[in-house]
Amino acid sequence: GKNCTSRSGAVIGGEPQDDDYDGEATRVVVGGNCQIHEHVTIHRATGEGETVIGNNVRMMAGSHVGHNARVDDYAVLVNNSAVGGHAHIGERVILSGQSAVHQFCKVGRLTMVAGSCMVTRDVPPFSIITDTHPLRWRSTNKIGLQRNGFESDERDAVRSALSKLFVNEINRDSVAEELAQSDYDSVVEIAQFVRSSTR
């Protein structure tokens, strides 16, 4: 992409750390206006597919994106955060320092992952996630929602939806079915995320 910066020691398109990789000609696609800081590594894909970095992504020193992963627009990977192979990081997600996302996991848009947190399951949009064992939903990303134009009534609806999901983890499917009937697109997005989750 245009207008990207890459600092010293960054490696973009290196061979993936995957035993299934057999030398195939795969690639990394980087969008525009990205900031790639010192010693960042972005591995190209294994097999078919691509490793994709969206537009306006900021990857701070030592952060890593594994093979076949996708990082959407405006995401921020803070120092030494890592994204495993085939993982999907949603738009405007913040991965705090030393955090990691396990392979094949999805992190929904406008989510903030706390420092040193290990994400081993899919995380719905608009969340703040802390701890590791077990992964714990702390709250709605209220500041992120405010900064992105969500009115107070919609923020309240998102908070209520996420609270229902995390209180009723055993009945997530029935909660998702209820949320899918919401008048708010953001709440419907949460329901769709849960329904499509595989982890």
Question: Model-found features: residue ranges?
Answer:
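Terminal amphipathic alpha-helical/low-complexity segments used for targeting or macromolecular assembly
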Residues: 3, 9, 14, 20, ...
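Structural signal for interior beta-strand "rungs" in well-ordered beta-sheet cores
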Residues: 1-135
